[in-house]
């Protein structure tokens, strides 16, 4: 793949269109049901050329145009991006994708971490069941999830672990949890290291686990891509939408304000052009 675009908002689809017009293979990756605030906007009046269109309709028009041009789409949360020579490896849930350039278009939403979560990441806390599940074979684990995607992950972990407890970070349907996975009606508050295990404190009590797996609809920028420079929670870019790492670009609300659709679309276009120039220089 030439360009992997992370995020399916206006910036992402605009980037995909321009990339395809440049003849580059392109995939747009975002969790199922994503679309940010725009997907819920009842009426948009300030996008040039379209009067009184809903956010959902506008997004679908962007999507259909990009797909008609040959862009691909994949429903998955990108949990980590790793440079690999002149390529990038993207860990997208249970798959690994490779691309020559990456354009980050995830919008402005940022997950709030639990106290102690970042400190224990890689040492008892994981965001990837497929990657780390085998380390907890025959052990006691917990799954903390903000959506139904965690149900599938819990089912996989149940095939390995001795026991799996499931905590909903946000309300969602847990009726399809497999046998052997226990839904716990408590709200996680913090994580810490206790007695050589991960201590999960809730609004009721503390539980000890060998491992804790956390699944959200977004990943903190500092954990998504090591070395990515940010400013006030936004990705720092130049006028060509180049980020601090070679081969990485960003567009839309993820680069900061103003948080406008037209601005996101324009930045997506610029990012695609810059990414195309970068790829051409790779030879």
Where are these regions (language model features)?
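FAD-binding core/adjacent interface of flavoenzyme oxidoreductases
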Residues: 1-6, 21, 73-138, 199-204, ...
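N-terminal Rossmann-like FAD-binding beta1-loop-alpha1 element of flavoenzymes
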Residues: 2-27
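Residue-level detector of alpha-helix initiation sites
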Residues: 9-10, 33, 148-149, 255-256
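Rossmann-like NAD(P)H-binding beta-loop-alpha module
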Residues: 21, 29, 139-160
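Glycine-rich FAD pyrophosphate-binding loop
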Residues: 21-39, 167-173
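Conserved N-terminal glycine-rich FAD pyrophosphate-binding loop of Rossmann-like flavoproteins
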Residues: 32-55
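A Rossmann-like FAD-binding core segment of flavoenzymes
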Residues: 66-85, 89-91, 97-99, 159-239, ...
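FAD-site-proximal beta/loop scaffold in flavoenzymes
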Residues: 113, 119-135, 215-263, 270-273, ...
């Amino acid at each position: 793949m030439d360009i992997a675009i992370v995020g399916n908002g206006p910036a992402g689809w605009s980037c995909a269109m321009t990339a395809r017009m440049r003849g580059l293979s392109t995939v747009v990756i975002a969790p199922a049901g994503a679309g940010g605030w725009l997907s819920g906007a009842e009426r948009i009046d300030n996008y040039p050329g379209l009067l009184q269109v809903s956010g959902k309709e506008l997004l679908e028009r962007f999507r259909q145009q990009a797909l008609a041009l040959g862009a691909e789409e994949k429903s998955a949360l990108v949990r980590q991006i790793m440079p690999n020579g002149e390529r990038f490896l993207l860990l997208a849930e249970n798959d690994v994708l490779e691309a020559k350039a990456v354009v980050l278009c995830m919008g402005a939403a940022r997950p709030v971490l639990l106290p102690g979560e970042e400190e224990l990441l890689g040492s008892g806390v994981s965001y990837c069941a497929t990657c780390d599940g085998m380390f907890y074979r025959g052990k006691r684990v917990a799954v903390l999830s903000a959506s139904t995607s965690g149900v599938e992950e819990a089912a996989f972990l149940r095939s390995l672990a001795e026991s799996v407890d499931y905590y909903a970070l946000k309300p969602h349907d847990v009726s399809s949890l497999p046998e052997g996975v226990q839904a716990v009606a408590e709200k996680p508050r913090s994580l810490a290291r206790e007695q050589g295990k991960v201590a999960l404190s809730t609004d009721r009590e503390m539980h000890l686990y060998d491992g804790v797996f956390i699944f959200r609809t977004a990943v903190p920028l500092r954990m998504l891509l090591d070395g990515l420079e940010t400013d006030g929670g936004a990705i720092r870019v130049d006028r060509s939408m180049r980020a601090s790492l070679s081969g990485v670009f960003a567009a839309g609300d993820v680069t900061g304000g103003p948080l406008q659709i037209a601005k996101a679309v324009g930045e997506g276009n610029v990012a695609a052009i810059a990414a195309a120039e970068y790829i051409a220089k790779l030879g």
